[in-house]
From Swiss-Prot:
Residues 742-775 are annotated as: Disordered. Plays an important role in signaling via the cell surface receptor PLXND1. Mediates reorganization of the actin cytoskeleton, leading to the retraction of cell projections. Promotes focal adhesion disassembly and inhibits adhesion of endothelial cells to the extracellular matrix. Regulates angiogenesis, both during embryogenesis and after birth. Can down-regulate sprouting angiogenesis. Required for normal vascular patterning during embryogenesis. Plays an important role in ensuring the specificity of synapse formation. Residues 32-516 form the Sema domain. It comes from the Eukaryota. GO terms for biological process: axon guidance; branching involved in blood vessel morphogenesis; gonadotrophin-releasing hormone neuronal migration to the hypothalamus; negative chemotaxis; negative regulation of angiogenesis; negative regulation of cell-matrix adhesion; negative regulation of neuron apoptotic process; neural crest cell migration. Keywords: Angiogenesis, Developmental protein, Differentiation, Disulfide bond, Glycoprotein, Immunoglobulin domain, Neurogenesis, Secreted, Signal. Glycans are attached at N44, N126, N330, N595, N596. GO terms for cellular component: extracellular region; extracellular space; plasma membrane. This is Semaphorin-3E. It is found in: Secreted. Belongs to the semaphorin family.
C-alpha cells in the first residue's frame, strides 16, 4: 500500500505541476512584489489597531459604509473604528459577563479563558441600531447597540443593560463554528445550540415569523457540520420566493466507501418557511442541500478533490439575483496538502436544486437518482400566490410534499465550478489559506477579479487569474505578498470596501487596514508598470499610477496597461534595451582577490523575472552568457565566484527577462587583484608607514562596534583574514584617483543607489542587502 500511495502522490504532483506551471513565460508562482510589515508602515499603506486593554480576541467584524465605521466584536468588548484610519478615533463598549455567570461556567468544567463574553454576532438591525450577541460565559446573550442616525452622531452604547437570552442565535462555545445573517427582522443562524456543542441546527429567531429550526438528531440534514457562510439571494422579483443559502462542510452519508469523508454543501431554504401543519411542525419544510465540488480534472476521469470549505465570498454584480460565489477550499487527503479557489455561478447552483433528488431505498442499497413521482408543490419551493400560486404558506402544503421533503433533503447532482476547474491551486505548503475577499476591476483590456487571500501567518496575497479560452488553461498571477501583521498570526476575518479601495483584516490580536494598491512601488519606468500586470495601475506617461477607466477621473489620455499579457515591449515601444543600448547602463565597479570568493550583487525588483548574466572580456565587443558550474554559482542575491580566477575579470551584465521583455538591471566591471600583490603590499607596510603613506586617514566609515556585512559573508565562505581585506578596501576608497570614479559608481561594498540607503534603518546599513534597486 505504501508503494501505491507513493506512486499516486507522484502522479498527482506531476499532473498538478504540468497543469498549473507549464507554458508560462514568467515565474508567476512567486509574488512580483513582497512587502514586509515595516515597509507597509513606512509607505503609509497600512494602519493597525491594537486593543488598549492588551487583548482583543476578535471573533467578528461588520463594515458600515454609511456610518463610515468598522465594528469589531472581541472578548467582553465591542469597538467602533474609523474606516478612514482605524487606529484613530475609536469608541468602545465594555460588555463582560457577570461574576456569577463566570463562576458557574468555571464550576461546570470550562477554562477561565472560555468563561467570558465573546461577541459573535454583529448585524445592522436598522439605521440607528446594531444587533449583537455574545457567548456570555457559555450562556448566550443578545442586546442592541445604539449607533446614531448621522455620521456626526457620537452615540455608541448598549441600548439597555438588560440583555435577552441568545440561545439559537449565538453559540455557547467561543470556538464553535457559526454563521448568521439578518433578513428584515429575522435572524437566520447555523450553529451548535447546546452547552456541549452536540446539537447542530439552522435556526430562525426574532421578527414576526415563528421561531423554527432543523429537526433534532437527523443526520440526513446535518452531520457534524462546520458552518462557513450564509447569504440571502433572491431568485426573482417575488419577495415570497427569496431563499437563504448556507455554505458548510459535513460528514457525507452518501460516501459509502469512506465513512469519514468530508463534503462541502450548499443548503437552501425559503425565508418565509413556517413549517408544516401536521408534519415538521416548527421545523424547516423547504430545506434542501447539494454537494459543492472543487476539483482538478485528472487522467482517466480521476479528479483531485478539495473537499473542505475554508471560506466563501459573495461578489455582487449589477444583477442582484446572480452574484458570483468564490469558495476557498483545502484538501482532506492524507496524500498531499493543498488549497484551491473555485468560482460558481448561481445558474449552476439553481440547476442542481431544480434537478433530481438523491434516493436510497434501504441500508443495503446504493444512492441513486429518485425516479418516482415528485409531489406538488415541488419540495424545496417557496409558498407564494404570485402568478397564480395555490399556497400562501408552507402550512398549506399537502402532507405528501412535506413528507417527501423530510426524507429527500439531498440533491443528486453536484454543483461544479466555472470552467470545471479551480481558478487557483496552491500546493507548495508554504502557508495555509484561510480567508478570501474579491474586488472586480475594470482594466484597459477587460474586467478582472482581484483576489485578496488571507493566510495563517499574517500574510495577504493579492492575486489575479487569467483564463485562456483557446488553451482551456488558467494562469494565476501573484501581484503582491503583503505581511500585514508584525507577528505571523492567522487571519480570521476580512472585510472589503471597493468604494474606499481598502481591505480590513482581523486577527485574534489586532485589526489592520491596507490599501489595494501602491502603484509607484512597481518602478519609475513604463516597462516596470506594464510588467506588473496590476489592473489597478497603468503608465500615464510620467509615472505608474492608479488606472481609471475612460470617462471616470481620467485626466490623461496616455494610459499604457496590459494585464492579460504583460507585453511591455509593445506597450513601451522604444524603451527596451537591445544591442548597443546596453552600454548606456550606469557602470558599477567591484574588486575581487584572486583565489578568494566574490559576489556580484544583483536582485531585480520583480521576483517573477528570470535573471541572465552576460560577460564582456577585455576589449571584446561580443557578450557571452555566463556559464555556471561548481565554481561560479547563480544565486538569488547575484553571481557568486567561489574561487576567483584572473580570467574572470571583465564587465558583467545582469539582465532580467519577463514576458519576453529584456531589461539590464546592473552593469558591473570586475577587477581581479592578484593574491601575491596583495600579500606583498601588506607585508611591506608596517603600522607607522601605513598611516604616513595612506592618502587619507585609515578610518573605517563603519561605526565602531558595527560589523560590516561583508565580514559575515567572508566568514561564511571561509576567508578569515578580515583585517587585510578591510585595509585593502580602505586604500581603494581613499585613493584620489578612485574617489572621483566611484562617486557615482560605488564599489561592491557600498549601496548602488542613495535611495536604498534612505530606505534602510541604521542598524542595517552594513548588512547584506535583501535587494537592489534598478540602476
Amino acid at each position: 500500500m505504501a508503494s501505491a500511495g507513493h506512486i499516486i502522490t507522484l502522479l498527482l504532483w506531476g499532473y498538478l505541476l504540468e497543469l498549473w506551471t507549464g507554458g508560462h513565460t514568467a515565474d508567476t508562482t512567486h509574488p512580483r512584489l513582497r512587502l514586509s510589515h515595516k515597509e507597509l508602515l513606512n509607505l503609509n499603506r497600512t494602519s493597525i489597531f491594537h486593543s488598549p486593554f492588551g487583548f482583543l480576541d476578535l471573533h467578528t467584524m461588520l463594515l458600515d459604509e454609511y456610518q463610515e465605521r468598522l465594528f469589531v466584536g472581541g472578548r467582553d468588548l465591542v469597538y467602533s473604528l474609523s474606516l478612514e484610519r482605524i487606529s484613530d478615533g475609536y469608541k468602545e463598549i465594555h460588555w463582560p459577563s457577570t461574576a456569577l455567570k463566570m463562576e458557574e461556567c468555571i464550576m461546570k468544567g470550562k477554562d477561565a479563558g472560555e468563561c467570558a463574553n465573546y461577541v459573535r454576532v454583529l448585524h445592522h438591525y436598522n439605521r440607528t441600531h446594531l444587533l449583537t450577541c455574545g457567548t456570555g460565559a457559555f450562556d448566550p446573550v443578545c442586546a442592541f447597540i445604539r449607533v446614531g442616525y448621522h455620521l456626526e452622531d457620537p452615540l455608541f452604547h448598549l441600548e439597555s443593560p438588560r440583555s435577552e437570552r441568545g440561545r439559537g442565535r449565538c453559540p455557547f462555545d467561543p470556538s464553535s463554528s457559526f454563521i448568521s445573517t439578518l433578513i428584515g427582522s429575522e435572524l437566520f443562524a447555523g450553529l451548535y445550540s447546546d452547552y456541549w456543542s452536540r446539537d447542530a441546527a439552522i435556526f430562525r429567531s426574532m421578527g414576526r415569523l415563528a421561531h423554527i429550526r432543523t429537526e433534532h438528531d437527523d443526520e440526513r440534514l446535518l452531520k457534524e457540520p462546520k458552518f462557513v457562510g450564509s447569504y440571502m439571494i433572491p431568485d426573482n422579483e417575488d419577495r415570497d420566493d427569496n431563499k437563504v443559502y448556507f455554505f458548510f462542510t459535513e460528514k457525507a452519508l452518501e460516501a459509502e466507501n469512506n465513512a469519514h469523508a468530508i463534503y462541502t454543501r450548499v443548503g437552501r431554504l425559503c425565508v418565509n418557511d413556517v413549517g408544516g401543519q401536521r408534519i415538521l411542525v416548527n421545523k424547516w419544510s423547504t430545506f434542501l442541500k447539494a454537494r459543492l465540488v472543487c476539483s482538478v480534472p485528472g487522467m482517466n476521469g480521476i479528479d483531485t478533490y478539495f473537499d473542505e470549505l475554508e471560506d466563501v465570498f459573495l461578489l455582487p454584480t449589477r444583477d442582484h439575483k446572480n452574484p458570483v460565489i468564490f469558495g476557498l477550499f483545502n484538501t482532506t487527503s492524507n496524500i498531499f496538502r493543498g488549497h484551491a479557489i473555485c468560482v460558481y455561478h448561481m445558474s449552476s447552483i439553481r440547476a442542481a436544486f431544480n434537478g433530481p433528488y438523491a434516493h436510497k431505498e434501504g441500508p443495503e442499497y446504493h444512492w441513486s437518482v429518485y425516479e418516482g413521482k415528485v409531489p406538488y408543490p415541488r419540495p424545496g419551493s417557496c409558498a407564494s400566490k404570485v402568478n397564480g400560486g395555490r399556497y400562501g404558506t408552507t402550512k398549506d402544503y399537502p402532507d405528501d410534499a412535506i413528507r417527501f421533503a423530510r426524507s429527500h433533503p439531498l440533491m443528486y447532482q453536484a454543483i461544479k465550478p466555472a470552467h470545471k476547474k479551480p481558478i487557483l491551486v496552491k500546493t507548495d505548503g508554504k502557508y495555509n489559506l484561510k480567508q478570501i475577499a474579491v474586488d472586480r476591476v475594470e482594466a484597459e483590456d477587460g474586467q478582472y477579479d482581484v483576489l485578496f487571500i488571507g493566510t495563517d501567518n499574517g500574510i495577504v496575497l493579492k492575486v489575479i487569474t487569467i483564463y485562456n479560452q483557446e488553451m482551456e488553461s488558467m494562469e494565476e498571477v501573484i501581484l503582491e505578498e503583503l505581511q500585514i501583521f508584525k507577528d505571523p498570526v492567522p487571519i480570521i476575518s476580512m472585510e472589503i470596501s471597493s468604494k474606499r479601495q481598502q481591505l480590513y483584516i482581523g486577527s485574534a490580536s489586532a485589526v489592520a487596514q491596507v490599501r489595494f494598491h501602491h502603484c509607484d512601488m512597481y518602478g519609475s519606468a513604463c516597462a516596470d508598470c506594464c510588467l506588473a500586470r496590476d489592473p489597478y495601475c497603468a503608465w500615464d506617461g510620467i509615472s505608474c499610477s492608479r488606472y481609471y477607466p475612460t470617462g471616470t477621473h481620467a485626466k490623461r489620455r496616455f494610459r499604457r496597461q496590459d494585464v492579460r499579457h504583460g507585453n511591455a515591449a509593445q506597450q513601451c515601444f522604444g524603451q527596451q534595451f537591445v544591442g548597443d543600448a546596453l552600454d548606456k547602463t550606469e557602470e558599477h565597479l567591484a574588486y575581487g582577490i584572486e583565489n578568494n570568493s566574490t559576489l556580484l550583487e544583483c536582485t531585480p525588483r520583480s521576483l517573477q523575472a528570470k535573471v541572465i548574466w552576460f560577460v564582456q572580456k577585455g576589449r571584446e565587443t561580443r557578450k557571452e552568457e555566463v556559464k555556471t558550474d561548481d565554481r561560479v554559482v547563480k544565486m538569488d542575491l547575484g553571481l557568486l565566484f567561489l574561487r576567483l580566477h584572473k580570467s574572470d575579470a571583465g564587465t558583467y551584465f545582469c539582465q532580467t527577462v519577463e514576458h519576453s521583455f529584456v531589461h539590464t538591471v546592473r552593469k558591473i566591471t570586475l577587477e581581479v587583484v592578484e593574491e601575491e600583490k596583495v600579500e606583498d603590499m601588506f607585508n611591506k607596510d608596517d603600522e607607522e608607514d601605513r598611516h604616513h603613506r595612506m592618502p587619507c586617514p585609515a578610518q573605517s566609515s563603519i561605526s565602531q562596534g558595527a560589523k560590516p556585512w561583508y565580514k559575515e559573508f567572508l566568514q561564511l565562505i571561509g576567508y578569515s583574514n578580515f583585517q587585510r581585506v578591510e585595509e585593502y578596501c580602505e586604500k581603494v576608497w581613499c585613493t584620489d584617483r578612485k574617489r572621483k570614479k566611484l562617486k557615482m559608481s560605488p564599489s561592491k561594498w557600498k549601496y548602488a543607489n542613495p535611495q536604498e540607503k534612505k530606505l534602510r534603518s541604521k542598524p542595517e546599513h552594513y548588512r547584506l542587502p535583501r535587494h537592489t534597486l534598478d540602476s
